[in-house]
Amino acid sequence: MDQDTKTIIQYPTSGDEYDIPFDYLSRKFVRVSLVSDTQRILLDNITDYRYVSRTRVKLLVSTDGYSRVEIRRFTSASEMVVDFSDGSVLRATDLNVSALQSAHIAEEARDLFSTSLSIGQLSYFDAKGLQIKNVAAGVDNTDAVTVQQLNKIIADVVTTIPDSVADNIRGLWARVLGDIGITLVDGSFETGATITTRTQALWSISGRKCYTWAGALPKVVPENSTPESTGGISETAWVDSSSKALGVLLAGPSGAERVGLKQGGTVQDAINWLTFDSFDIVKDGSKDVTADIMAACVVANDLGLDIKQNDGTYLVSGNPVWPVYNSLDLNGVTLKLAAGFTGYFALTQKDSTTVYGPTSPIVQAINAAGGRTAGSGVLEGLVNSTELDGKFLFMEGADVLYYSRGTAKYWWTNTYLSNRGKLSDNLKYGVSAITKITAVTPRTKIVYYRLPNLDFGNGPANNGVIRVLNNTRFIMQGGSISNRPLKDVSKSPVIISLNYCAAFKAYDFFDPYPAFAVDSNNSLIYSYTLNFNDIADAVFENFNSQGYGWGVVGGQRSTNITYRDCNLNRVDMHDPYMGYLKVLDTRLGTWGINASGMGDMYLERVTVDLDDSAHGGYREHEGIINARGDFGGFHDGGLYIKDLTIVGEASAFEAASGHPVALVSAYSFNASLASIPESSPVTPWGFKEVIVEGLHCPFKRTGRRFNSIISAPSIQFTVYHPMRVKLEDCNFNSTAFEKFDLRGWRVTPYNPSKVGIANTLAFRPTNFVDVKDCSMVGLEFTRPTRAYDYSNFDVNLVNVKNVEEHSLSPFTLYTNQCGRYNLVGCGLQQIVDKSMTSGERANRRSTFSVTGGTWNSLSGNPTDITYGNGYDIPVVATGVMFVGPYSQTEVTGANLNVAEFVQASGCKFLSSGPTYIQPLLWSGAGGPTGASANFNVARGNTLGLNISAVNGETSQVIAATLVIPQGFSTGPAAGTTYGFTVEKNINYQLGLNARSLKANVGLVRCSDTITGVYLNA
């Protein structure tokens, strides 16, 4: 039966225990039956079967005569599991069970419909391949008939059926033989006939065959004869005509498709491709067959055929170049590479490439016209030319973009040109002149390469066993490495190499681990599973090369690269890529990603395992995601991360360096060898923006997770800090502050005049940091050294908390970087601001605003703000719940701290009790002559005053308020209130000393007596 049902399942009767794959509310709603094609029997629980577990039953009866066991849920629609009629307490679970029973009934109704006679999509009744029982005999012409009626009809006509069938077969043979010039005469062996020519054939009714006569003519055949009784069947007597018909069929245009081959396929396939077996190449690995494979490749190319061989082990040696112009299928083959082997398959597209130099008419036409500016999508010099239409272009230009390893790297771009100069990729940078174009014509059909297994047991010294050159529109699949040594000495093996390729996909290559190659001095040298240069629009999928080694690398001039579902120790791009680099659904090893870029990088659902215990702590770069330091350390584009998971720890690196890795790093190793000249159109960003949406760290880390979220651990100062950083849904799961270390970055491009920023509100923001829905112990901003300290950060923190430790360890913000800091809905412990210390760039004015959320300072103060010559701007808090060592009965450090450094509005204060309080700032007896005081209050705060008023024998405690003005000079701030019980006016006054944007209260005076001053937020 169709098993696409949720409440009915049938199993073959191959055992005595069977699973119940659906949920059910009661065992009485489960039915177990034995079923055959003609009968069904419902079994009884306990006597016929029993429950082994809630989801499994065991039969207790024989299944002889039955082919299937059916388990079906049949929930009662009248016998409700939950009864709401008795007036008892209604619980949520009751509603859930009742709803579930209704859902079960609905599912069973749908399954009953799907397994019953129903109307199909084309208006017919569908019996699902089952018998229809208990059908009445048909009456009208349009009624269904029963088997009984049909048997009677058959009995009436059965004697005529053989003749009808025989006539049909005879007619078919007459047509087939007629096509080859043979005539089927009237009559048969059974009725008698006469054959007069070699082109006549006689029909045998009983044998259902036709025969020609090879003996003496004429040949008279009497009635009731057979071929055997009238001369026999032989080459000189009766000849079966089917052999002649077969010859004609094989000679026809489709004849080759009708003959199979032992190794699979047909003769027609063999005409389309050839095999190594066609050349009798030894395939047990006992003989060197290098030359034989060369011969096969040459013949295949000459005849325009594919190569297909799916078994065998082939021993090869030397340095052969086996050219392949068409498809290659070596899946199942093992190439056993001899020691020192350096040969390769050259998978290429013959006559596909044309190179145009600077003096060629086509390049001169481009340079003489427009369209070479940044962002252009049309080369105007080609609008009226068709020469490059429909080609992939690899273009080079005259302008230096950057220096890497001391070498000037010139302008380039890879793209596809459709027609009239239209490019598929707009120019990232403009260029003064094009100097070279390599044009590759796309294939008119897709070719397929299925790669062999490569046996490295003999220690080959190859540099690219599979090389793809000047090629487009191909699909490369499979391939693997076996017997790879753990270490290669003085060898740099590269497995797959691609150059000047476009619009292709390569997938399912398995390298058990990347090669770890060293020179004779045991120093690391390159060795790659995959290497490519000058490619465009490439997809690498399900590549495996995980372990201690280099992994995969992109060389120069590569555009639009995607890695998907891969397992790699590292993704590397030597020269910067253009367009995009995408790493999707991939697992990376400790070295992560090293790639400078002139485009955008995308990481989605990537896991990075930092464990370097077997790596000795060696890292080329500090970060998990890095812009390559030996190529300038820049990344002129964005970094976009979704759902990044970090596991393992780089403990060996941390032990050697004294700090953990960074999340992102960008810096030059040596600015004299790797940098961007001022004339270059490249902007030296260390990623222009970094957007992280989802960072997951499932294992707790002691200390900070990253040395810096964005890092430039260098004194080269060659790249800019990202203009924008956004962190959302990130759980750092660490026990110490995370950090933005702003040291090592170039002076921001948004303050090129190096204006000293004394007030964050008086200068435009230079960098933006947004942190939302994140969990961390704290966040620290460490400012640059003085010569580079010209940044003004705009920082927004929304719903940032430490969810791992809950409210026991809320989030802390630490900074000495001038900026605007806005916190919304955070679980805050403390704001620490050292940006106005008396050292470098002293007395700068940062701003802080806190809106909503909880500010739990635990046992300490809510702020720790150090200033040099007066603190100008308080923290503005609106609608915040303050929790900490606040008191309404005694003056505490937390009381004084919040009043001095926080301008509070609409806030509440809690201490250990459940009642809101007003923090006490002063207590005493401030009467008409005044009482001295010494506490600071941020301007704009409202103070509450407790006044004890007396009028004769009548006394009253009066609560009054006094707002500290935003603008004032040293002097009194006064107010008047009225005592209704004492029936008189009460005057009060605080003596204030101006201290920038806060006031020092030095005197408390009242016409009666002020007994307490509180912060009234």
From Swiss-Prot:
InterPro entries xref list: Coiled_stalk_dom (IPR008635), Phage_T7_tail_fibre-like_N (IPR005604), Serralysin-like_metalloprot_C (IPR011049), Tail_spike_N (IPR040775)
Keyword tRNA processing included in the entry's annotation: no
SUPFAM superfamilies for this protein: Adhesin YadA, collagen-binding domain (SSF101967)
Pfam families: Phage_T7_tail, Tail_spike_N, YadA_stalk
Cell compartment(s), UniProt: Virion
Keywords, alphabetical: Degradation of host capsule during virus entry, Degradation of host cell envelope components during virus entry, Host-virus interaction, Viral attachment to host adhesion receptor, Viral attachment to host cell, Viral tail protein, Virion, Virus entry into host cell
Tree of life domain: Viruses
GO terms classed as biological process: adhesion receptor-mediated virion attachment to host cell; symbiont entry into host cell via disruption of host cell envelope; symbiont entry into host cell via disruption of host cell glycocalyx
Signal peptide per UniProt: none
Gene3D superfamilies the UniProt entry points to: 2.10.10.80, Serralysin-like metalloprotease, C-terminal
Cellular component terms (Gene Ontology): outer membrane; virus tail
Function, in words: Functions as a receptor binding protein (RBP) and probably mediates the attachment to the host capsular exopolysaccharides. Displays a depolymerase activity that specifically degrades the KL64-type polysaccharides of Klebsiella pneumoniae capsule, which allows the phage to reach the host cell membrane and bind the entry receptor.
Domain notes: The N-terminus anchors the RBP to the virion. The central part and C-terminus probably binds and degrades the host exopolysaccharides.
Subunit structure: Homotrimer.
Protein name: Depolymerase, capsule KL64-specific
Gene source species: Klebsiella phage P510 (Bacteriophage P510)
Lineage, highest ranks first: Viruses, Duplodnaviria, Heunggongvirae, Uroviricota, Caudoviricetes
